[in-house]
Amino acid sequence: MKGFFTKMAIVAGCFAFSATMMAQTKALSLSTYEGTNVAQYDGQTRNVSMSRSVFNGWNTFCVPFSMTTEELDAAFGAGCKLETLSAIEANGNEIDLYFTDVKAGGVKANTPYLLYYTGENKSVRVQAKETTIEADDAPAVLFIADNAFVQFNGAAKHIEADEQTAMYGIYVKDNAEAAFTLVTPETNGFYATRCFITVDGVKNPTFKAHHGELPVTAINAVKAENSSDDVYNLSGVRQNSIQKGVNVVKGQKVMVK
């Protein structure tokens, strides 16, 4: 009988393991409107499927999993473009946003992007196979220029616009040029998997998007800082040059992609 119960325990254990594996390999359906609490799936490798509305022109895109370039093309067409914010310039309340092409590297989890779509306005099926879920309630990248702190944010859930926090997004009527404008409480705010910009240090900012180029001043600034003794990592250790990720330069956090 002891041997029988031991075998039963082994069988039960194997069944539980198999059930867990089946649950993790089953396609995970995510909401692109209200959002999905993906914390319960954090670290799991899953097949992911979701339905996302897109419009001809520039859209925004941020998801809690990675996608290959091939999966991106399968969803949005081979003519789609994928760009991320790489630098900013500030002149008074005028802020220039510099976006660069990163499509060749695919989609990285919790990274805010601009997505250019050449098809007709519709809802498309987005799928990714065996991708790792990475939970992040507030994905964002921060850039600093003069007194302007510009943050490019991803919406992990539906975020309503309010009077307290100025949030800037791309309306469909403005998406030919990726024009970021103030989103008012009268609108629906930002649905999950979309992106928006917030700004500190500048009142009533206006934005101009640039694609496929970087400002000369930003390039020179990076080169100059590479020889500076004022570059540290987040642990306070001095660096010989600016590294990828978050650096502390002259007391300010600077993101390098």
Predicted regions and their residues:
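Bacterial N-terminal signal peptides that target proteins for export
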Residues: 1-11
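Sec/Tat signal peptide C-region and signal peptidase I cleavage site
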Residues: 17-23
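A short, polar beta-strand/turn micro-motif
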Residues: 24-76, 101-179, 183-217, 255
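N-terminal low-complexity, intrinsically disordered segments
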Residues: 80-102, 108
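Acidic surface patches and DE-rich sequence motifs
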Residues: 89, 173, 198-199, 233, ...
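C-terminal outer-membrane/trafficking sorting elements
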Residues: 215-257
